[in-house]
Amino acid sequence: MRHARGYRRLNRTHEHRKALFANMAGSLIEHEQIKTTLPKAKELRPIVEKLITLGKRGDLHARRQAAAQLKEDKDVAKLFDVLAERYKDRQGGYVRILKAGFRYGDMAPMAIIEFVDRDVDAKGAADKARLAEEEAAAEE
């Protein structure tokens, strides 16, 4: 019986799961949309939603808590500067999961996990330069 089993183990150790979700959360923050298996997407959603809530709090302690969960500083910066501003008026529900068929090799159910109101031009590292160019063009 699976009473009081609060999460999916995904056939991984605790440390492996922790690293997996840290990497996936960073990728989702960087690209704003990723494709993964459905169980991983369902487990990732509450992790990312809590990170967005930390970003909305915006204080130093929240930034340190987010940095402890994410691996890269650029992801923490985007979380607090871009995403927190985007979702400041939204009370939860920052992420959506769309079913995306089945993987060819093993028929694993796939899903696309993305931010609601996402930036469709988000392509990772070039984001900061692109946003700076758009702001400069808007000021002129």
Swiss-Prot record:
Q: How does it assemble?
A: Part of the 50S ribosomal subunit. Contacts protein L32.
GO cellular component annotations, sorted alphabetically? Answer: cytosolic large ribosomal subunit
What's the family? Answer: Belongs to the bacterial ribosomal protein bL17 family.
Its Gene Ontology molecular function terms?
structural constituent of ribosome
Q: Name one GO biological process term.
A: translation
Q: Name one Pfam family in it.
A: Ribosomal_L17
Provide the alphabetized UniProt keywords.
Ribonucleoprotein, Ribosomal protein
Q: Which InterPro entries match?
A: Ribosomal_bL17 (IPR000456), Ribosomal_bL17_CS (IPR047859), Ribosomal_bL17_sf (IPR036373)
Lineage, top-rank taxon, reads Bacteria
The cross-references to NCBIfam families, in alphabetical order and at most eight, read:
L17
Protein's name according to its UniProt entry: Large ribosomal subunit protein bL17
Species of provenance:
Ruegeria pomeroyi (strain ATCC 700808 / DSM 15171 / DSS-3)
